Amino acid sequence: MDLEQKTRGLSKSCALLIVIAGMERYAFKGVASNLVTYLTDVVKMSNSRAAKTVNTWAGFTSMLPLFSAPLADTYWDRFFTILASSSVYFVGLVGLTWTAFAGSRSATKTISSYFLYSSLCLVSIGLGVLNPSLQAFGADQLDHDLDKNFDLSSGDQKDAKATRKTQFFQLWYFGVCTGSLMGVTVMAYIQDTFGWVLGFAIPGIVIFLSILVFMSGCGIYVYAPGARLKKKTTTTPFEKILKFIKGRVVKQRSIYTLADEKDLDAMELELEERPLCKCETEDIETPSTTSKGLEDDESSKTVFSGIDNVKLVIRLFPIWMMLLMFAVIFQLPATFFTKQGVTMKRNIGSNFKIPPATLQSTITLSIILLMPLYDKILIPITKRIKKNGTGISVMERMGVGMFLSIIAIVIAAIVERKRLAISQKMKTLPDYDPETVPLSIFWLLPQYILLGISDIFTVVGMQEFFYSEVPVRMRTMGFALYTSVFGVGSFVSAALISIVEAYSSSTGDRQNWFADDMSEARLDKYYWLLALTSTISFVVYIFLCKFFKSSSDQGDEKEEAPK
């Protein structure tokens, strides 16, 4: 079997998990893409508060994997973790549906708001545990597939595995984008046309079906060793890190521990006995020292292994930090881009209005349409130019996406300035409509499409980057680092909105950049601010890439994947 045949397709278990990931995205995007509209139109929040609520919720959802992933890697079984988290996810969506139903029949919003936040928290908890576990479970299937099928010479095998790995992440992301596309387009129309009860009920039904689909594949999955077995036979990387940190803390405390006051006068300094030649004493064992020596040796191995694992994770954080502004920009389509679209001309014919959230589908649609071109055109060209088996590197891929996101936000600022200028001119006319600007919503398409193209480069690159740069048995943690970029980015976005809002409306005649009246808001200035900060992050990222060395380049020993 030649290299091309071996890199052609994935196993049935990988394909099934990709379908499940697409169903999960359908449900999540069906709720998240239009949530800001629900909060402003139904719950009656201000624009800034609704945007901060959505960003905080998205951040909380994306940050949870950082806490759940170590537990999943160390103690939990991935299969049952996926089942349990999917069930919590389903309960949260049922609660969200009940909230919309109760709110539509109650004049008071107190109970409805309480259950709204509770339901959103359940969705966050379920999704925050499900996502990294599902991806890591898919990686288990991939590793088994690679070890089973590849028996090539070392150089060819490395390129073949890299190609198959990239193919897996691209197909995974293709499935995720397909689900997102369906969720944004179909659910936004249903929510705007048939109401929020049905709009929240359908995602719950989809998650319930995904649980049934997942359980149908029990016979074809490859299962990693259970948590109990792992705990008995070997120490996990996360446990080694904890032991290393605990050992350092205990050591520091022992240094500064003084003797009791009554013994201070009798203190005597003694030098520790050490052999002159370490090599001659390593093989000598005595009954009094053998057990202690073995214990010290095991402790030493744990310490050094802990140091290695800590270094492997910590060295990723400079790159992780520079990706945050990319994540901040990606919060805009679900918040301010959608609010912009509400004020623009959305009619197609006389009877149909485009739901503003539907434009988010152009991001995923551009990904679905352009990703094959990436594989068939860009990768072969870069392979010929760089004369290697992989083409564009993961670091270069993320950098291209960051650059395109900056271009997208610059275009967004220019379009918003044009919308504001038309709005100001319309105020002088007698038939002025403050809720609609005679500017087609399709003016927003370029910024959406560019964000979709940048997504192909950066998001898929981030998945592969964090997957490849952590120890194999910390893989769930690697996926958690990827999702945490968007989690912290959401919190950074909410913090920026609060700071800018406080600054722009604090004194004098300054107008709130996020005013509820979109004809008075200055989102263009906010977009220019994001363009500036993103450019700074991009420049620093390029600088860091020159000094970053991949773990594979360093020759780090990797633990073997479960078979």
Swiss-Prot record:
The keyword Membrane applies. Its main location: membrane. The chain crosses the membrane at residues 56-76, 82-102, 110-130, 168-188, 194-214, 317-337, 362-382, 394-414, 441-461, 479-499, 528-548. Expressed in roots and flowers. The modification Phosphothreonine is found at residue 81. It comes from the Eukaryota. Gene3D superfamilies: MFS general substrate transporter like domains (1.20.1250.20). It is found in: Membrane. Pfam families: PTR2 (PF00854). InterPro entries: MFS_trans_sf, POT_fam. One of its GO terms (cellular component) is membrane. GO terms for molecular function: transmembrane transporter activity. It is a multi-pass membrane protein. Belongs to the major facilitator superfamily. Proton-dependent oligopeptide transporter (POT/PTR) (TC 2.A.17) family. This is Protein NRT1/ PTR FAMILY 5.9. The gene is NPF5.9.
